[in-house]
Structures are given as C-alpha cells and as structure tokens.
Amino acid sequence: RQAAIDREQNSRKPKPTVRKTIQEVYQEYCVNGRNDRAYTTKRKQDSLWKNHLCARFGERYIDEISAAEVVDYLTELYCSRGLSYRYVEGFLKMFYLLFGQAYSRNYLDVDSYNKLCVNKDTKIHMPKLKTDDELDIVAFSREELAILDDYFHGTNAETAYLLGRYCGLRINECYGLKWSNVDLKNGTILIDRQMQYQESRIKLVSLKTRNAKRTIQMCDKLKVYFQGLAERREQDQLHLADLREQNQRIIEDLDGSKISSTELVNCLPDGKIQTVNSMKYPTQEIKAKYGIMFKYHYLRHTYGTMMAELNTPQHLLCSQMGHGNIQVTQRYYIALSRAGIDILRENLNRL
C-alpha cells in the first residue's frame, strides 16, 4: 500500500520542462546548493570538476547520461588510468551529487533518478576492487611505536605526536587545539575546531563533521605530560615574553576573531607557530633512518586498533574518535593486527 502511495505521489511531481547540461547543474549547485559545505569539501569538488569531469561531461545533458556510461568511466579511471580506489570513490560521490541536484530541481524525472541512484540492480556503483589493492587499516606495531616514542621524545613535534598516539586526533585537530580547551583538572580535551590553510592563510575553522566535536579523556601518562607542558608554558610567558610577542603569529579563530599563536598547544617556547607542515620533516627522517612509513594519520589508526584490541565498547570508541557512523569504528574491531593475530593463535591453541 505504501509503495502505491509513493508511486502516486511521484506521478504528481512536475515533469522536467527544461533540459540542463551537467555544467549548468554544477554551476547552479555552486551558487545555491553548497553554502553550508566546508571549505575543503568545496575545494575537492571544484578540483574534480575542473580537472576531470568538466571536459568529459560538462556539455552533455544530464538526462541523457546512463548508469552504464558512468560505471564505464569509473572503471576507466580505476583500471586503465591507475587512480586509487579511494580517489575514484570521490568521482562516484560527485555523480550522486549531480544527479541528486538535478532531480531536486526537476531536471531529471523520477524514473531516471531511481534507475541512476536508487535501484540496487541498476544504480551507479564502483568497479570491482582489484585483488592486490589494500584498503586495510594501517597501524604501527608495538616495536614500531617504541622506535617512534624514542624518536619524538624531546623534539618540537613531541606534543603533536602524543596527541595522535594517545588521543587519536586528526592532524588538523591536533594543530588547532587551544590551551583553553585543555582541562588538566578533569583530564579532558575538548575538540571543537581544526587548523586549515585557506587561500594561503592559517585559520581555525569548523571540524570535519558534526560528530567530530567531542570531549576526549586523557590517559594518566598524557595528563602528566600536559601538566609539565603547562608549567613550562608559564615559565616561558615570564622569561620569554618579548621574544614570544615578537615571534607570535596572529591567526583567525573559529568565530572570526584574531588570536595569537601562543594560545595554541602546539606553539614553540619562543612563540613561533607550528602547523600541519611541521610533520613533514619527521616523516622523511623516520623513513630514512628506520624504514618506517610514517603518516600522522596512522597514529589515529593505531589508537583505534589498540583500543579495539583492549575490548573498548564500540560506542565509546566511536565517540572518542569522532566518527559519524559506527560502521567506521567497527573496522578497527575486524582489522587483523599483529597483536590480534597473536590473540587468535593463543585462543586456537586452547581448542
């Protein structure tokens, strides 16, 4: 009965009266449909459009594009051009976006939209994953962590490293952390903004998603470290006041106000700001010295993997990591880490 009602309602929807090219649909979306989107989202969409989609599909009418044509194009990108699976997924999202915009503005009829985006047998989809492609979570082993702990100890990047190691922060969240969001008494850290470069300017902006805003619990080791860091900061404010004032950088905060770089947790004693680029040199040196492929985001993977191995309830880990979907968190529970394999073998030997 509900299906009949839905069909009746859809049949009353006005038929498309104006044909639009994909370029016209995208331009209309840019003007009217994405005012609430994040800066990085807009940049990524514009990059895919200008560098790939515009030349191939821009002049085509959106109502003449078939699902097979889209799937063939995605297959070409992934299999023939060798683009990564994750990158090609961005193209799939763009097509869903364009078809959705066209449907909502009556440039696509309901049957065409359902065929392209709803019906599981006909809708556009990613090509089959290659057998040699790895989408597994990359996490550091205990042995690698011991090397990294020793490498970062006492360096300018130690604070950022520990925030990734023991809190699982994203790199932009880490460098956007303000001292006012660190509660040493209760041992918590409030994550409510991130650092970004926008038009070559450093800004503190909104988080990646709504769920990314969260309060993180600090472990005892990190709490002790931050207590010492706060004490050293007080001493620096007294003894290096002139130098800090000279080297400070004024940046734009979340609310548009101007703040000093000295308000950030990742600020050098002399007042100089640290940014996401501060991890570039350690990344190169770790690879050269130890042969470890270090990416800051792998610390987040490691945090999630280790917390899952310790049987942390999924809803708690989801909250701590700021995931918008618990299915993302569940990946850490099914990933096979070295420690997980050891536990599995130990249990197998008990059979």
Put a short name on every predicted segment.
Residues 146, 200-204, 331-351:
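DNA/chromatin major-groove-contacting recognition/catalytic segments
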Residues 18, 27-107, 272-278, 293-298:
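N-terminal core-binding DNA-recognition domain of tyrosine site-specific recombinases/integrases
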Residues 118, 123, 177-254:
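Conserved tyrosine-mediated DNA breakage-rejoining catalytic core shared by Y-recombinases
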Residues 85, 89-93, 102-110, 114-177, ...:
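Basic, Lys/Arg- and aromatic-enriched nucleic-acid-binding interface segment
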Residues 53, 70, 95, 148, ...:
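Conserved hydrophobic/aromatic pocket- or pore-lining residues that grip, position, or stack substrates
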Residues 150, 154-155, 167, 216, ...:
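Short, basic (Lys/Arg/His-rich) helix/loop patches that form interaction surfaces
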Residues 188-191, 295, 306, 315-336, ...:
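Short functional hotspots where side chains directly engage DNA or cofactors
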Residues 1-68, 232-261:
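N-terminal DNA-binding module of tyrosine recombinases/phage integrases
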